[in-house]
Amino acid sequence: MDKLLIQGGHRLSGEIAISGAKNAALPILCAGLLTADTVQLSNVPNLQDVTTILRLLRQMGLRAEQDGDKVVLNGSAIDKLEAPYEMVKTMRASILVLGPLLARFGEAKVSLPGGCAIGSRPVDQHIKGLQAMGAEVTIEAGYIHAKAKKLKGTRIVTDMITVTGTENLLMAATLADGETILENAAREPEVTDLANLLVAMGAKIEGIGTDRLVIQGVERLHGATHAVIADRIETATFMCAVATVGGDVTLRNARTDTLDVAFDKLREAGAILTSGDDWIRVQMASRPKAVSFRTTEYPGFPTDMQAQFMAMNCVAEGSSRVIETIFENRFMHVQEMNRLGAAITIEGHTAIINGVDKLVGAPVMATDLRASASLVIAALAAEGETLIDRIYHLDRGYDRMEVKLSAVGAQIQRVK
């Protein structure tokens, strides 16, 4: 099993190219199920989760050709309307095939999802929404089995803001009969990116980027060409790394309009940030100052950035409080950071971090995707050598992170 070996204490300098967004690419790839025509995608990241979803889609009969960051999809020969447990258990985003299959073919059988260990993240909002659109849904032997001759447009108010729930219901509504209104919809940029692709495919969607989406169902969707947006979480991760260890790094192919909260907190920590249309420069010459924050839905502070900013706070000047409101179990990285010498205590949904003068390298273990990224940042700041185990979590959502960091001066290598 691969591990990362990191020698800490090196400043970062140079340029890093940002990849396409994982959380946009996954639903966008599933949208290929909605049409028999060809969908051409670019800026698709090279990630384990993308490989997994493509394997699942191919198993259903979707043709998918991949060349670098380009993927060409064709859904004219789909012959299997099932997502089996073996495929879904490794990645909960597989649930995103449910809406498209049901809308286009009138039936879908999808295993209840697996994925991260950071919380239950139930799919009940997906199911309730599809039932409101007229689907018959049963759960038996660990599978969601949904049927509908034709989904009917309706008004859906989700009990909570759910990104994948919004995406699933949005895709289903594009081919439904009549008007669907999604209230309390997720506003994340990745949802907006999916909606923009669907419009390019012929969908009629109003309110894109707001919490109220109005969809007029159409008879069929056609092919389209689309570039996946830049990954704001990867961008923030590298920004955080520079702010933690110091240096001067320019991030290319980045989006600045989705990172307001990260900009605010990094400037509060003492980083100097400048940016253009597709680049961000991060300069840090001093020890960071501690920053407190509370995770919440977009446009608030993303839960997917929580662990990385906590790593920065570990070596920051002062004390900070981090309140996690989205997922339970999302402080699993704390124990590993404390092994490196951090001073973090947990009180319910709040982590209290007292910045220390230095971290010291030690063997640690990644527990989930963003936790693994936070351990990389902490290891870059630590004195001596850190060995991070179970980095398959990292590969799920970061495109060759160690290669990108090595290019800007980090002493990091992948070992067996």
From Swiss-Prot:
The keyword Transmembrane helix does not apply. It catalyses: phosphoenolpyruvate + UDP-N-acetyl-alpha-D-glucosamine = UDP-N-acetyl-3-O-(1-carboxyvinyl)-alpha-D-glucosamine + phosphate. The gene is murA. Its EC number is 2.5.1.7. Keywords: Cell cycle, Cell division, Cell shape, Cell wall biogenesis/degradation, Cytoplasm, Peptidoglycan synthesis, Pyruvate, Transferase. The modification 2-(S-cysteinyl)pyruvic acid O-phosphothioketal is found at C116. NCBIfam families: murA, PRK09369.1. It comes from Janthinobacterium sp. (strain Marseille). It comes from the Bacteria. InterPro entries: Enolpyruvate_Tfrase_dom (IPR001986), Enolpyruvate_Tfrase_sf (IPR036968), MurA_subfamily (IPR050068), RNA3'P_cycl/enolpyr_Trfase_a/b (IPR013792), UDP_GlcNAc_COvinyl_MurA (IPR005750). This is UDP-N-acetylglucosamine 1-carboxyvinyltransferase. Its main location: cytoplasm. The active site is at C116. Pathway: Cell wall biogenesis; peptidoglycan biosynthesis. Cell wall formation. Adds enolpyruvyl to UDP-N-acetylglucosamine.
